[in-house]
Each structure stands twice: as structure tokens, then as C-alpha cells.
Regions:
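N-terminal glycine/serine-rich phosphate-binding loop of ATP-dependent small-molecule kinases
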Residues: 1-97
Length: 97
């Protein structure tokens, strides 16, 4: 039996979703981490980049723990994100600008 998996990170407007698939495309586990919405102007929405980053790490950790697998068993990673989104990270500190 092949014990390798595909990890998908879906970074949406309201939450970070992480889904683990087996090689047959079946969902093994899923995790959802909601993040706070900020509305500085009508029709605008902003997010805390640090919160998103932490949500991604926590969701991945939870998926690996719940599925009882290691990162070594992840054979592929897919990432989807919000359209029309920009985020800048400081090269020296690794922190969001």
C-alpha cells in the first residue's frame, strides 16, 4: 500500500483550509482555520498576514497529527489563494510588511 499523500492549502478570504488526499484522490483529512476580517473602507477587506501564516502552519500540523503521518509522506503540495491579493514579506526578517 502506498502511504504518500497530496496536501492542498486553500487560502480563502475567510479561512485557511488544508485538505489531505490519498493517491486515489480521496479526502483523508481536512482542517479549517478561520481568520479575522478587517474592513478599513466600504467594499475592502484586509487580513493579518501573521495570523494567516500561523493558521497555515497550525492546520498542516493538525492534518499530519490527525492522519498519523509525517511530512516525508507528502509527495505533492498544491496551493490556491484569493484572487486580487498581494502580500509582501521582508526578506531579512521573514515578517509581513
Amino acid at each position: 500500500m502506498d502511504n504518500r499523500y497530496i496536501l492542498v492549502i486553500d487560502q480563502g478570504t475567510s479561512a485557511t483550509k488544508v485538505i489531505l488526499f490519498n493517491r486515489k484522490g480521496q479526502v483523508v483529512h481536512r482542517c479549517n482555520r478561520v481568520h479575522k476580517q478587517y474592513y478599513p473602507n466600504p467594499g475592502w477587506v484586509e487580513h493579518d498576514a501573521e495570523e494567516i501564516y500561523k493558521n497555515i502552519l497550525k492546520a498542516i500540523y493538525d492534518i499530519l497529527y490527525e492522519a498519523k503521518i509525517t511530512g516525508q509522506q507528502i509527495m505533492a503540495l498544491a496551493i490556491t489563494n484569493q484572487r486580487e491579493t498581494a502580500l509582501v514579506w521582508d526578506k531579512q526578517t521573514g515578517k509581513p510588511v
